[in-house]
Amino acid sequence: SVTSQIQVVQFNANWNSANGVDWLNKLSDCKINQVDIAVDKAAQTKYQIIVVPTIVVFNNGEEIKRFQANIMMQMESKLEDIQNLVDETVMESF
């Protein structure tokens, strides 16, 4: 299905959990994953995560956009920003 092709991944670290994005589970039409870069350093390197949290949206394994936290390690992007991107990506696949 189209939904399974779109993946939203939050990269964060356990020492920054207070700034984690807790609304990701409200997204629809996509798969959601969490990666703790304090534990999975290989993922941090592979995806070049320089600030946490970082939310990366993938379509068929290809990164289409990333949303990065500000200098205070807080995510300024909102649920709507990411849902709109997911919705656009779903529509483009038809």
Predicted segments with their positions:
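Extracytoplasmic/periplasmic, Sec-exported soluble proteins
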Residues: 35-36, 47, 74-78
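Generic anion/oxyanion-binding catalytic loop in active/binding sites
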Residues: 33, 44, 71
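Local sequence-structure signature of Cys/Sec-based thiol-disulfide redox active-site neighborhoods
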Residues: 1-31
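Structural micro-motif
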Residues: 47-58
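Non-catalytic, surface beta->alpha helical segment in thiol-disulfide oxidoreductase systems
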Residues: 57-94
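A short acidic, amphipathic alpha-helical/loop segment
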Residues: 21-23, 43-46
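Soluble periplasmic/extracytoplasmic beta-strand elements of cell-envelope proteins
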Residues: 7-10, 54-56, 66
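N-terminal post-signal-peptidase region of extra-cytosolic proteins
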Residues: 37-42
